[in-house]
Amino acid sequence: MATETSTLYDTVLILDFGSQYSHLITRRVRELGVYCELQPCTVKLADLKFKPKGIILSGGPNSVYEEGSPHVDPAVWTYGVPILGICYGLQEIAWNLKGEVKPGDHREFGQADVTLDAAATASLFAGITSPTRVWMSHGDQLSKLPEGFVVLAHTPTSPYTAIGNLDRKIFGLQFHPEVTHTTHGSQMLRNFVVGICGCSNNWSMNSFIDFEIERIRTVVGEHGHVIGAVSGGVDSTVAAALLSRAIGDRFHAILVDNGLLRLNEAAEAEHKLREQLKVNLK
């Protein structure tokens, strides 16, 4: 049986509430040398094949107080690992831990200067000076702190811009640290995944590629063959390149032209796969 990457490296679980930035959170964490996996927000922790060192709750377009809005597995709150909620994720923390969330007086969208409170310097905002510029994108806001939480940062219009329960290592941000508009966003994420979660930042894309190639060889075996459909898009092209590097001509790629490709795109995809990536294209 092939080994999963998440069992070899310290792994952060990112729960996706439908934010346009969810994949960007994943990218930013991996850029820090920490492996992470993006899963639907409804995933059951008991179904995971790994034990995460920390959990990040993404933003999302819903309101936590509305019927039908997505919520995490209740086991998240007793799992015992650090949690970081971003935007909707902060509101999800408050909604589940006896805080209060309400519609804001107006939507906040764009850059804002955040003032750090005294409790901030020893945790999520270590090494960051006040004020710091962040990127807001929200309509709802926290109106009452959950039990055991303190304010870490605020703005004139958002008194609970960042909150934390320092004992339980649960933190919430009403802004997006993953976007480049947040000046020290990468440092905040590093403080969480490395400083608070204790993850080793020893993962890299090169090591991931080498690992996946060996995993493919283990699964396929010395004499096995694989047939795969490719479209020329990023996902199928990366998969084809990995399979080709792993098992050579024992991977048989079939280019699928569904009639909806752009002018000359099928020919360009064929050239890229056959000539540049040396994929065994049928």
Question: What label would you give each PLM region?
Answer:
Residues 1-57, 61-72, 77-82, 91, ...:
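RNA-binding accessory domains that recognize and position tRNA/RNA substrates
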